[in-house]
Amino acid sequence: MLSEDEKEKTPPSVMTSIPDDVIMECIAPRVPRYNHSMLSLVSKQFRSLVASPRLYKTRSLLGCTEDCVYVLIEDCILEVARWYSLNRRTKRNMPGTVENRLVLISSLPPMPTAASYVVVGSNIFVMGGRYDWNVEEWEAQPPSSIALCIDCRTHTTRLVADMPVGLMTNVSKVIDEKIYIVGRVWASATIVEFDLRTEKWADGTKPGWEADDRWLTSLSTTAGRGPSSFENNCDHKLMEDILMDKEEIKHYHLFDNECVMGNILYVYDRHKYILRTYDPKQRTWGVVKGLEKLPLGGDESYIVSRGKMLILFLIVVLEYDDDASFQKRELWCAEITVERREEGEIWGKVECCDLLLEGGLIIGSCLVVTL
């Protein structure tokens, strides 16, 4: 242990002597976000800088933004739902050290189940759902009307105005700076509207929308869960077209969710354990070939796109039980690159496939936030 005299003689760290402007403009924006926690250990100066909104503005101007994957894991044994972040595969977390890939965000509080989770910029809005895990009391108690906002830059939360009515089993969509949420109150379906500019609620509907079970069981691109590259809400029109196709809609109970990448819709078919595609220009369905390395038996799935890569989360149930908390479940994550070959077929390559967690797990949500 250093004496007081020795402490005074100890020269300051080279890093802490660097001006803030140099750190903010030249160093920190280029450091991958998964290394920010290590960077913040250097000094209090760095801790304040990596949490600064200015850093993320600079990252955007320099083209150094990243697509960060957030996964909500519901633990049926502990009866808690918590957010995790998925780190990119690096040399430090190659096979054998996958626990470094899925990181619990300890600063965020437990989350509700069956809620609406909506990405807007660097924020995640959490609306409605259930905080009580006692299913037997759900018929007697209405869903929560609490709404909060998660700032993904600092991993902090703040409350926003309560919903006019508590909803659960929600789907949602951001249109014209408003969040439209369709959910159930008891057995009936209701649509509510949240204005992002004023952060106030109002009863409202969108032309052509109907508050019925079709929307509650529709694909999540309609709900705004998956990143979309379609312009002018074409993804919404695409989903309407698909939902009107009676031949295809009969299969939707087998699809958990989907995402759009490169104007192609990708959805995991948990009945046949294959990754399906939908081409809106050709109006045809297809199958991604070359994915034999995926673990079989994905009983639940979530798929998102990060850059030019698909991230597929699979829950594999090894031992079945009516109560999920007594099931032996594994959470797998596969990173898949895809390419369209000359004959028009889409082929995929499994870049990595890791077992992340085990236990009585359910994937509550999976979102991509650009930071």
Curated annotation (Swiss-Prot):
Residues in F-box domain copies: 13-61
Repeat positions for Kelch: 123-165, 178-229, 257-305
PANTHER family given in the database record: F-BOX/KELCH-REPEAT PROTEIN SKIP4, GALACTOSE OXIDASE_KELCH REPEAT SUPERFAMILY PROTEIN
Organism per entry: Arabidopsis thaliana
Keywords of this entry: Kelch repeat, Repeat
CDD domains: F-box_AtAFR-like
Entry protein name: Putative F-box/kelch-repeat protein At3g10510
Chaperone recorded as keyword: no
Highest taxon, organism lineage: Eukaryota
